[in-house]
Amino acid sequence: DVAPLDRGENVRREICLTLEEMNIRPESSHHEQGPGQNEVDFKHAAPLTAADDVITFKNVVKTVAARNGLYGSFSPKPLADKPGSGMHVNISLARGGRNIFAPGPDGAYSPAMRSFIAGVLARAGEICAFTNPVPGSYARFGSFEAPRYVAWSHQNRSQLIRIPAAPAPEYARIEVRMPDVSCNPYLAFALLLAAGFEGMERKMELAEETPYDLYTANAGALE
C-alpha cells in the first residue's frame, strides 16, 4: 500500500507512542479537514483522569511537534476560512457496572440520558463561558461541523449535542461538541457533569430532536 500524502503521519505516530508510554491510550489518530489539522481520540476514563490526560496530551503534542521542527497550536480558530479545532467530550454514566445511558429493549433513549442532555442544554449558555473562554472560541462556531444553536440530534454533527451510533448498548454515550482545547478541562468536565446531574435530579424534559442540518436551515425552521 502507498502511504497517504500526510506529512503529519509520523508526528502523530510519535505522539501516540509517547502517550502510550505515559499510560494514556489513544484509540485513533488521523488528519482532519484543515491544513495541518490533526485529531487524536483517547480511550474513555473517569473525569479527573480524563482532565489530567488532556493537560498531558497538550504538553506531549507541543514537545513532539517542536522536536520535529513544527509548532503545536490548540487555537480554536487558527485560520479564518478553515475548520476550527474543538474538543468533543463524550459522556456516559454507569451505575452498578451498567451504562444507564443504554437504550431500552425498544431502542428508545433512556430517561437518564434524556434528562442529562436536557440539563446540559439548559445550562449551555452559562457553561460556554468556561468551555469556550477565548475570542477565537466564538469564531469557530457555526461552520465546519461546529455548533451554533442549542440543540441536539442523533448523528447530526451540526448540533451542540450528538448521540453517536453505538455498536452495543454498553457503548451508548452523548457527544458534547461545544468545548475547545483552550478551556480548563477540570472546570469544563465538572460543569458539564453538574448540569447533566441537575437535569437528572429535576427530571427535565428533553425538547424534540432537531434532525436537520442547522448550517443550511432557513430562518423559519429555527423559530
What are these regions (language model features)?
Residues D1-E223:
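Glycine-rich, acidic/polar active-site loops that bind/position phosphate-bearing ligands
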